[in-house]
């Protein structure tokens, strides 16, 4: 029995995707990692990296909404949830919302590398601000893995990207230099 027949929905990873950046590699301090099928993801070597939370979020979303064609990912970070889900939902379009400059930049590069520019609208901003989404935008599927620890509920990293991915902070109320309570 072939592997493809044994595991329903599994597809053998293919060649490097035809994205506009598929000829480039990671910058200094970054890695380019396999994420789903033939998709690759740019990540900082010592920054926030995709995790099983992202894999499970994408899996649950696409399992319970397998016909989604227009989806939203809130607190999207480096784009891992949306890219895993987009691989499982060929043809779906995605709006992602992320507050951090660095994470948005990595997500945009990953989308371009994977040839997803036409399927992804990567927005930078706070998803709690109504203006980030259009008044009449509708989505079949909404995923999210926003920060879930209040400040003081765990060890706070020295890395700014990691702090904002794990703790409920913003730039409005200080917790640590440059970071504030939500």
Where are these regions (language model features)?
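Conserved SAM/SAH cofactor-binding pocket of Class I
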Residues: 59-158
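Class I S-adenosylmethionine-dependent transferase superfamily signal
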Residues: 85, 176-182
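N-terminal auxiliary segments of SAM/dcSAM-dependent transferases
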Residues: 1-29
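A generic local structural motif
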Residues: 26-28, 43, 58, 109, ...
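Class I SAM-dependent transferase core
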Residues: 21-65
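Mobile active-site "lid"/loop adjacent to the S-adenosyl-L-methionine
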Residues: 146-178
């Amino acid at each position: 029995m072939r592997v493809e027949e044994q595991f329903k929905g599994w597809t053998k990873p293919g060649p490097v995707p035809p994205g506009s950046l598929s000829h480039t590699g990671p910058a200094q301090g970054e890695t380019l990692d396999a994420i789903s099928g033939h998709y690759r993801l740019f990540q900082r070597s010592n920054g926030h990296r995709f995790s099983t939370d992202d894999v499970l979020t994408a899996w649950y979303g696409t399992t319970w909404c397998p016909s989604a064609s227009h989806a939203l990912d809130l607190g999207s970070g480096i784009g891992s949830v949306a890219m895993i889900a987009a691989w499982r939902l060929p043809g779906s379009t995605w709006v992602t919302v992320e507050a951090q400059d660095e994470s948005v930049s990595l997500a945009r590069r990953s989308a371009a590398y994977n040839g997803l520019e036409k399927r992804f609208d990567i927005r930078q901003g706070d998803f709690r601000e109504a203006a980030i989404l259009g008044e009449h935008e509708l989505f079949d599927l909404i995923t999210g893995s926003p920060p879930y620890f209040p400040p003081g509920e765990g060890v706070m990293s020295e890395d700014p990207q990691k702090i904002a991915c794990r703790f409920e902070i913003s730039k409005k109320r200080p917790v640590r230099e440059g970071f504030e309570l939500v």
